[in-house]
Amino acid sequence: MKQSTLLTVTSLLSILLLSLHLTSDFIHNAGELSLRGLFISVLILVVLLYGTLVLAERRSGHVIMLLGALAALGMPVIHLMTARGVAGAIDRPYAFIFVWALLCLGVTGLFSFFLSVQGLLGLKRGQQG
């Protein structure tokens, strides 16, 4: 499979997992749900989606996918660094899905990060040659 196709697929998977994770956060922390937070979340996801699907072969698309990869990779880290951490969700009915989603976000985020960096380096070499 081509590297650009792999990057697109893993970026789309990361976007899907991020949207599911944000939904879970909004549901389980209903006090944090606001129109502003929802608008910002939608805006970020749309930018990630646009960069992945429309700008995939451009440097700007690779940069957007790189930022999305960092967001996906950072989600497990952020949750582990909070006071409650993942342990705060372990006794809840949704614990398995929550931890599984964090694990998948970390995996797809790291893989997308590597592919984005390789893609950016490939674009740079292609423009010099």
Task: Name each model feature, range by range.
Residues 30-44:
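Loop-to-helix transition at the N-terminal end of transmembrane alpha-helices
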Residues 6-19:
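Alpha-helical transmembrane segments
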Residues 1-6, 22-34:
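Short juxtamembrane and helix-loop transition motifs at transmembrane-helix boundaries
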Residues 29-33, 78-101:
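Interfacial non-cytosolic loop connecting adjacent transmembrane helices
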Residues 44-51:
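Hydrophobic, membrane-inserted alpha-helices
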